[in-house]
C-alpha cells in the first residue's frame, strides 16, 4: 500500500468538465457556450478487499475522505488502525482500497452481518432508531472560541472552494484556529463528504489542529453533528441553519452548535459556555 496521505496533486480544472450549455438572460436571446460543471463520481470504500459503501463525491482528497469516514462512522478509533490506502480507478468510478487492522476488520464484518437482509434505508448506515444521535461519549469542555474572530474565518472560507468558484456546486468544510485563521479546508459536491475530508485530515495533522472549531458552508444536519462529535470536535459553525435533530444531538453530546454564521452575527443553539463574545 502507498503512504496513507499519498495522492497526486492535480489542478482545479481536473475536477470540472466543460459542457455545452444553453444560457438565458432576460436582456439577451438564448445562447450556447461552454461552461464548467463539477465532477461527481461514485467512490467505493473497500476495506481489506470488501466493498463497504459507495458514496458520490468529488474525485479529490479521497484518502482524507476515507480516513474521516472511517473515524466518524466508528469503523476505527485511531488513524493508526489503517495501515495504508490506494486510490484506484474502477469500471464506473474510483475505489479507495484500505488496509484495515484485523481487529477492526472483524468488527466491521460483524456490523455488515447485522445489516444483512434488511431492506429500506431511511437513515443509511444506522442499524436501529436508538443509534441515531448517540456518540461514543459526551465531549469534554476543553475548548473556547472568541466569536470576534469568526468574521476572519468566514471571509476566507471560499478560498478552499476553487471548484466551487468555477461551478457554484460545492460545499466547504474548514478548520478554524482560535485566532480565526483557517488552518486548512476541503470541498466536495456532498456536504457530508467535505466534512469527512476535513475530519480525516485533522486526524493526521499535528497538535495545532487540536485547538479550534469546524466551519461548514452548508446547513448543520444531525449527521454533521454526530460526525463531528465522533471525531472529538467540540464546536461546529455552520453558515446555514441547524435542524431540530441536530440541535438535540448536539445538546446530548455536549457539542457547541452555531448556525446562521454571518459577519457580525450568529445563532448559538447549544452549549454557549465555550464561546466568548467581545
Curated annotation (Swiss-Prot):
Annotated signal peptide: none
Alphabetic keyword roster: Cytoplasm, Molybdenum cofactor biosynthesis
TM region positions: none
Localisation per UniProt entry: Cytoplasm
Entry GO terms, CC: cytoplasm
InterPro entries xref list: Cytidine_deaminase-like, FdhD
Keyword DNA-binding: no
Gene3D superfamilies for the chain: 3.10.20.10, Cytidine Deaminase, domain 2 (3.40.140.10)
Keyword flag Cytoplasm: yes
Single GO BP term: Mo-molybdopterin cofactor biosynthetic process
Molecular functions (GO terms): sulfur carrier activity; sulfurtransferase activity
Pfam families: FdhD-NarQ
UniProt-annotated binding residues for Mo-bis(molybdopterin guanine dinucleotide): 260-265
Active-site positions on this chain: 121
Lineage: superkingdom: Bacteria
Function, in words: Required for formate dehydrogenase (FDH) activity. Acts as a sulfur carrier protein that transfers sulfur from IscS to the molybdenum cofactor prior to its insertion into FDH.
UniProt similarity note: Belongs to the FdhD family.
Name used for this protein in its record: Sulfur carrier protein FdhD
Organism annotation: Salmonella typhi
Gene this chain is encoded by: fdhD
Amino acid at each position: 500500500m502507498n503512504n496513507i496521505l499519498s495522492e497526486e496533486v492535480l489542478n482545479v480544472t481536473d475536477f470540472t468538465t466543460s459542457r455545452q450549455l444553453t444560457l438565458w438572460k432576460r436582456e439577451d436571446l438564448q445562447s450556447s457556450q461552454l461552461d464548467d460543471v463539477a465532477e461527481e463520481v461514485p467512490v467505493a470504500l473497500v476495506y481489506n478487499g470488501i466493498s463497504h459503501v459507495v458514496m458520490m463525491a468529488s474525485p479529490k482528497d479521497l484518502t482524507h475522505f476515507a480516513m474521516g469516514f472511517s473515524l466518524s462512522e466508528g469503523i476505527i478509533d485511531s488513524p493508526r488502525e489503517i495501515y495504508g490506502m490506494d486510490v484506484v480507478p474502477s469500471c464506473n468510478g474510483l475505489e479507495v482500497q484500505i488496509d484495515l487492522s484485523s481487529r477492526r476488520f472483524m468488527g466491521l464484518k460483524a456490523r455488515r452481518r447485522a445489516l444483512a437482509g434488511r431492506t429500506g434505508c431511511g437513515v443509511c448506515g444506522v442499524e436501529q432508531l436508538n443509534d441515531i444521535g448517540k456518540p461514543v461519549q459526551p465531549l469534554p469542555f476543553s475548548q473556547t472560541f472568541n466569536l470576534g474572530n469568526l468574521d476572519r474565518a468566514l471571509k476566507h472560507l471560499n478560498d478552499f472552494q476553487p471548484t466551487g468558484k468555477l461551478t457554484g456546486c460545492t460545499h466547504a468544510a474548514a478548520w478554524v484556529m482560535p485566532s480565526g485563521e483557517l488552518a486548512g479546508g476541503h470541498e466536495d459536491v456532498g456536504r457530508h463528504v467535505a466534512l469527512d475530508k476535513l475530519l480525516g485530515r485533522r486526524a493526521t495533522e499535528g497538535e495545532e489542529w487540536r485547538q479550534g472549531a469546524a466551519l461548514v458552508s452548508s446547513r448543520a444536519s444531525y449527521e454533521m453533528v454526530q460526525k463531528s462529535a465522533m471525531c472529538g470536535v467540540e464546536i461546529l459553525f455552520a453558515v446555514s441553519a441547524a435542524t431540530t435533530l441536530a440541535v438535540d444531538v448536539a445538546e446530548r453530546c455536549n457539542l457547541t452548535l452555531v448556525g446562521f454564521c454571518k459577519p457580525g452575527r450568529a445563532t448559538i443553539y447549544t452549549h454557549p459556555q465555550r464561546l466568548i463574545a467581545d
